[in-house]
């Protein structure tokens, strides 16, 4: 193989073959022609590419326009077929001249009765005038100083009170309307306990009777009196009185005479009855003395008994 190649090269580059080669001028001309052909081919290719790019750009622009136009056409069809008929129906429903419904009738009735002028009662007018006069006399500085402004709610409350007062039934002025129940009960008890013929208070004036009939204690006595202590006193009084009565009965039976009833210091058993206002709270010393005296009396009764 190497021998054949070397032989071919020698034949090609031999002297005879070199004479057959073209001249250098013809070679340069061929080069120029080849370059022109290449330039023309490249120019044609570029021109064709530019044409394709332009066509593609126009196509894309037309496609965007077509899409926008398509959206506009769809919106126009929706407005014509959906929006306008629906809006027309709503307008017809609102401005229809058909028979009104219940809500409309109620609204018209309410408007009719609220627009009617109403005349307030004379008592309400008097209260309102009095309130206006007081407000004018005090002036706005009074409310500003107190940090309060004359509000509408206060006026409404006062007018409502006046209306309630006018609507309330007017009861006749009788004893059960004017006199409280506690005073009536106290008066009934006083009448029942009063002895017949002779005055219980032995000529006492009307001032003492009215003073005894007062059903309440003054503030000073109310502060000192305790309910539990009063109940304890009453229970203690009842037990000691029962013991005294039993001892007196035993003593009377032993001696053959009826012993006098021991004088009680309770307000209910006393002949004159101490007034409710003059009642005092028993102290521990008084209770101890009373208990010691009762024990001595009971021992004397048991010692005298056979």
Swiss-Prot record:
<keyword id="KW-0597">Phosphoprotein</keyword>
<dbReference type="InterPro" id="IPR040046">
    <property type="entry name" value="FAM228"/>
</dbReference>
<feature type="region of interest" description="Disordered">
    <location>
        <begin position="237"/>
        <end position="277"/>
    </location>
</feature>
<protein>
    <recommendedName>
        <fullName>Protein FAM228A</fullName>
    </recommendedName>
</protein>
<comment type="similarity">
    <text>Belongs to the FAM228 family.</text>
</comment>
<feature type="modified residue" description="Phosphoserine">
    <location>
        <position position="270"/>
    </location>
</feature>
């Amino acid at each position: 193989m190497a021998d054949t190649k070397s032989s071919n090269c020698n034949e090609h580059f031999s002297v005879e073959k070199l004479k057959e080669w073209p001249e250098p001028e013809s070679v340069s001309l061929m080069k120029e022609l080849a370059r022109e052909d290449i330039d023309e081919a490249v120019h044609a290719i570029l021109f064709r590419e530019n044409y394709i790019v332009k066509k593609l750009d126009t196509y894309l622009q037309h496609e965007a326009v077509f899409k926008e136009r398509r959206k506009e056409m769809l919106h126009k069809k929706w407005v014509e077929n959906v929006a306008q008929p629906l809006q027309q129906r709503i307008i017809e429903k609102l401005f229809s001249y058909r028979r009104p419904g219940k809500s409309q009738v109620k609204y018209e009735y309410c408007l009719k009765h609220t627009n009617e002028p109403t005349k307030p009662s004379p008592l309400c007018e008097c209260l309102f005038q009095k309130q206006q006069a007081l407000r004018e006399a005090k002036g706005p500085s009074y409310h500003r100083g107190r940090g309060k402004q004359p509000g509408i709610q206060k006026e409404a409350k006062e007018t409502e009170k006046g209306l309630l007062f006018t609507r309330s039934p007017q009861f006749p002025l009788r004893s059960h309307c004017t006199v409280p129940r506690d005073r009536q009960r106290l008066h009934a008890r006083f009448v029942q306990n009063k002895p017949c013929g002779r005055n219980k208070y032995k000529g006492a004036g009307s001032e003492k009777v009215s003073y005894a009939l007062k059903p309440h204690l003054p503030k000073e006595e109310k502060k000192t009196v305790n309910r539990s202590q009063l109940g304890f006193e009453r229970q203690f009084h009842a037990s000691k009185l029962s013991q005294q009565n039993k001892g007196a009965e035993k003593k009377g039976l032993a001696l053959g005479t009826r012993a006098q009833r021991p004088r009680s210091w309770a307000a209910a058993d006393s002949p004159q009855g101490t007034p409710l206002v003059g009642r005092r709270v028993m102290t521990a010393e008084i209770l101890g003395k009373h208990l010691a005296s009762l024990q001595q009396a009971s021992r004397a009764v048991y010692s005298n008994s056979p």
